[in-house]
Amino acid sequence: RIRYKGIVCDRCGVEVTRAKVRRERMGHIELKAPVSHIWYFKGIPSRMGLTLDMSPRALEEVIYFAAYVVIDPKDTPLEPKSLLTEREYREKLQEYGHGSFVAKMGAEAIQDLLKRVDLAAEIAELKEELKSASGQKRIKAVRRLDVLDAFNKSGNKPEWMVLNILPVIPPDLRPMVQLDGGRFAASDLNDLYRRVINRNNRLARLLELNAPGIIVQNEKRMLQEAVDALIDNGRRGRPITGPGSRPLKSLSHMLKGKQGRFRQNLLGKRVDFSGRSVIAVGPTLKMYQCGVPREMAIELFKPFVMREIVAKEYAGNVKAAKRMVERGDERIWDILEEVIKEHPVLLNRAPTLHRLGIQAFEPVLIDGNLLRLHPLVCEAGNADFDGQMAIHVPLSEEAQAEARLLMLAAEHILNPKDGKPVVTPSQDMVLGNYYLTMEDAGREGEGMIFKDKDEAVMAYRNGYAHLHSRVGIAVDSMPNKPWKDSQRHKIMVTTVGKILFNDIMPEDLPYLQEPNNANLTEGTPDKYFLEPGQDIQEVIDGLDINVPFKKKNLGNIIAETFKRFRTTETSAFLDRLKDLGYYHSTLAGLTVGIADIPVIDNKAEIIDAAHHRVEEINKAFRRGLMTDDDRYVAVTTTWREAKEALEKRLIETQDPKNPFVMMMDSGARGNISNFSQLAGMRGLMAAPNGRIMELPILSNFREGLSVLEMFFSTHSARKGMTDTALKTADSGYLTRRLVDVAQDVIIREDDCGTDRGLLIRAITDGKEVTETLEVRLQGRYTRKSVKHPETGEVLIGADQLITEDMARKIVDAGVEEVTIRSVFTCATRHGVCRHCYGINLATGDAVEVGEAVGTIAAQSIGEPGTQLTMRTFHTGGVASNTDITQGLPRIQEIFEARNPKGEAVITEVKGNVVEIEEDASTRTKKVYVQGKTGMGEYVVPFTARMKVEVGDEVNRGAALTEGSIQPKRLLEVRDTLSVETYLLAEVQK
């Protein structure tokens, strides 16, 4: 078969064969002196050291020719494996005579020692020792036993840790590339191998010449160092550097870390049948569709198209079919249309922070070079239309089925982290629906009565009725809505816009007249219906003007729709909501100009008053009535209050029809702080060190900033930019570690049958409730039955799933704590069971066996990590000595159970705070807690802010001051469960 077998090129003497051998054939270097392998000598723990029972320090001295080691003492009183310096060695030789004992240096000596290790005997001896040993000795024995046992079982010999022959990797893995300009760029490995060869050859020549011992020794040491650098450059001593003092990349570096062989090329390959392009919005797409450019699709689906061409006999064989595709034959486009039907593709938005970052869509062919993305899917992958996305084609039937069943975008309506809709409309869609549902008094057509929707729309289109005017409509024209019997056959007061808005709602939802949950869950309020013979204008005049539907109202409607009708109906409804929003946002034609930014009438007064107050504070400080710290706090508080006063005035005087106000109020874009910087004042800025500067920026953007004010603004702007860049990496690393520990937590079985549970109540922080009991109960299983606290009636039995309605019922009955099944107490081995986990938040149903809940949890914590600010030190204006860590660093602190910065003082006694006395001489406060068993006395720093007052009742482990509790201290005072609960509460903050 092989044509060139055995032929050698007559010009360069190289065998003629496949080019592939340059990746397969290895060479080797025969070393003229044994060399130790740095991994086994320097790795932690040192395998060589453990095998020989020598310290790494001693090994290093021997291997690098700084000391002799006794290999065989023969009849002399020397200890085997003891070290001798050059001088001691000479003295001992003179003392005992030449040949009376054997001592060597270098890797050769280590090799001899390793050959002498009797594995079986050593293992037996260690097992004996383990029976009696304790403490450090025991740990060391266990470690040694591990290594020796491994040698014994694998059949590898210990002396093989020292190399006599050094393998050389194939040339294609350490290539030389010719650059344009005739120069060559070579892999660093070539330099490292070259050093080894040069030193090895020099050593061979010295040995031939019988050179003096000291020179040979030096050359052997250099050879050892050259091999070390080749295997792991920089592990010992200073790394060998190339041009520009750059450390050379050794074999270990080729494998290590994110850029190494494993993570870069083996786990993270680039794949065929993928592409990437800039994304643009596709408002006409359905929720499960995406637009793919023709040129891209033909390349991605090429093999499928070629198969069809041959099947349709347009071409005789695959080669001809390929040529046909490459020529761009007219007939291929129809075939492409057929091929992509029912064949989903995956779209990925980098960085993929959670599982919603990759979703499946059905491709729709479009012209141009852009990928088109459905606007509602943006929120999930945090996509905006200024970047690129990648597209992948699932090839096998199984992959296609998985994409269609598990990953289709229309299925992913709820966020797996909290079960809230992740596909809420944003920006224009919100604005359009907001404008559509506005109400206005006295607009044209007010008080008209229509027989049905079509008549109302006709009146609006022809200019007889305004979108916002309040009109009547016959209830019977919407027979499928869930009206109360008393409401049927009547006339209802609503607006033309709301008629259109309700037209797209699922039929079983009530007619939405007010943007609140009562209307959504219980039906339209009775006050909007006319009694027979009533005058419509009177009813209209008696009604208040409703606020329009905002972003969060739309979110609630979507959640309710999903709860009642599940995925298919919800995704169809979302598309209708999107179209309606875009349409009316366009019709409304909202624009903003500089004149739309309002002017606050009393701004000058507010600012003068603040200046006056600051002057008074400074006077008091100069008289010695307050400390500098107090003055700083007072000044910054004054300016903060001034800014808030302006904000308040802004909200009071704003015109609800102002485009800025509409955008802000609807939740489409911007918030009150943006608005107050445009119209109020910019306020206080942070200096580069994070401390808030006392000089506020008095101007707003409408008036324009002075040069100095502009300069102050740049501090925080720059800090913001750098923080964003730095925190992304930190957050990514945290996610990686979380996934690493949680990935094998999977739902393994239906019920673990544990009798333990977790007693939960609302999570509070001080006096404020951070998470209500109702929210915590939803979707969990009860551990014990829950009884009504007054009547004793059983509200729900043991081991039952608590639905949303049930949770509300339990809380309404006045129950304050419930024992539920929890993953903390689950008894399943290697995972958790369905009952302890509860519902799968992404679907709203009980979780399936096999769901990878650990990874979902890790991603749910990691994904918002990027949004958490890096505001490490955030003090309430007070430059106190207890800086409390916040944001991402705080999350890391919790997961690693570090001792927190700004630690809170906790009480070990359960009881009442009886007094808090201040001691000015030591600058501390003392807190006394009286319990049943005795009095607890706690010393806290003078500047710490107290969380308790005299007379408060405290439990064991409660924090007396603001700050973070150290988990280890809490564990000493309470039990594991309360530590788990505390950590849970902290992460949820």
From Swiss-Prot:
Zn(2+) binds at C752, C826, C833, C836. Binds 1 Zn(2+) ion per subunit. Its cofactor is Zn(2+). GO terms for molecular function: DNA binding; DNA-directed RNA polymerase activity; metal ion binding. It is an enzyme of class 2 (transferase). The keyword ATP-binding does not apply. Disulfide bonds: none annotated. The keyword Iron does not apply. One of its GO terms (cellular component) is DNA-directed RNA polymerase complex. SMART domains: RPOLA_N (SM00663). It catalyses: RNA(n) + a ribonucleoside 5'-triphosphate = RNA(n+1) + diphosphate. InterPro entries: DNA-dir_RpoC_beta_prime, DNA-dir_RpoC_beta_prime_bact, RNA_pol_asu, RNA_pol_N, RNA_pol_Rpb1_1, RNA_pol_Rpb1_3, RNA_pol_Rpb1_3_sf, RNA_pol_Rpb1_4. Pfam families: RNA_pol_Rpb1_1, RNA_pol_Rpb1_2, RNA_pol_Rpb1_3, RNA_pol_Rpb1_4, RNA_pol_Rpb1_5. Keywords: DNA-directed RNA polymerase, Metal-binding, Nucleotidyltransferase, Transcription, Transferase, Zinc. Its EC number is 2.7.7.6. Belongs to the RNA polymerase beta' chain family. DNA-dependent RNA polymerase catalyzes the transcription of DNA into RNA using the four ribonucleoside triphosphates as substrates. The RNAP catalytic core consists of 2 alpha, 1 beta, 1 beta' and 1 omega subunit. When a sigma factor is associated with the core the holoenzyme is formed, which can initiate transcription. PANTHER family: DNA-DIRECTED RNA POLYMERASE (PTHR19376), DNA-DIRECTED RNA POLYMERASE SUBUNIT BETA (PTHR19376:SF54). This is DNA-directed RNA polymerase subunit beta'. It comes from Streptococcus pyogenes. The gene is rpoC.
